[in-house]
């Protein structure tokens, strides 16, 4: 039960950070308080960091909100999501 609650809190913190209400540093501190310096805590912190630096909302090679496409319109190229990164004019090769 405790692990399910921790996972639920973790997902809630990611959702709040994604909306921009709190920053990555505060979430990292909460993870340290709840999980400590464990392997699972390190994995959770890595996921939060990856989500926080995702500025165009590319998730799993999909442009969910069209932000990558909008970003690349300034250069006149099509936007492609590569994992969580947006690349203009570079389609996926796989």
Curated annotation (Swiss-Prot):
Give all cystine bridges in this chain. Answer: 58-81, 68-86, 72-88
Record's subcellular location: Secreted; Target cell membrane
Keyword check for Secreted: yes
Task: Show where the BetaSPN-type CS-alpha/beta domain sits.
Answer: 55-94
Instruction: Give the UniProt record's GO annotations in the biological process aspect.
Output: defense response to bacterium
Report the leader peptide range.
1-19
Entry's Gene Ontology cellular component terms? extracellular region; membrane; other organism cell membrane
Q: Does the keyword ATP-binding apply?
A: no
Q: Name one Pfam family in it.
A: Scorpion_toxin_alpha-beta
Tell me the superkingdom of the source: Eukaryota
InterPro entries per record: Long_scorpion_toxin_alpha/beta
* Entry GO MF terms: toxin activity
Keywords (alphabetical) are: Antibiotic, Antimicrobial, Disulfide bond, Membrane, Secreted, Signal, Target cell membrane, Target membrane, Toxin
Expression by tissue, per the entry, reads: Expressed by the venom gland.
Its family remark reads: Belongs to the long chain scorpion toxin family. Class 3 subfamily.
Reproduce the free-text note on domains from the UniProt record: The recombinantly expressed N-terminal domain (AA 20-47) induces cell membrane disruption, leakage currents and cell death on HEK293 cell line (tested at 25 uM). Does not inhibit potassium channels Shaker and Kv7.1/KCNQ1 (tested at 18 uM).
Please, what other remarks does the record include?
A: Negative results: does not inhibit potassium channels Shaker and Kv7.1/KCNQ1, when tested at lower doses than those inducing cytolytic activity (18 uM).
Sum up the protein's function in the record's words. This full-length protein shows antibacterial activity against B.subtilis and K.pneumoniae. Also shows a potent inhibitory effect on the ookinete (ED(50) 0.7 uM) and gamete (ED(50) 10 uM) stages of Plasmodium berghei development. In addition, induces cell membrane disruption, leakage currents and cell death on HEK293 cell line (tested at 25 uM).
Identification of the protein by name? Scorpine
Annotated organism of origin: Pandinus imperator
């Amino acid at each position: 039960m405790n692990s399910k609650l921790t996972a639920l809190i973790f997902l809630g913190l990611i959702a709040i950070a994604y909306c921009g209400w709190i920053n990555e540093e505060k979430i990292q501190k909460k993870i340290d308080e709840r999980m400590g310096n464990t392997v699972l805590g390190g994995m959770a912190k890595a996921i939060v960091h990856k989500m926080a630096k995702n500025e165009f909302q590319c998730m799993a090679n999909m442009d969910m909100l069209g932000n990558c496409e909008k970003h690349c319109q300034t250069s006149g190229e099509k936007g492609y999501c590569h994992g969580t990164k947006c690349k203009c004019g570079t389609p996926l090769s796989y």
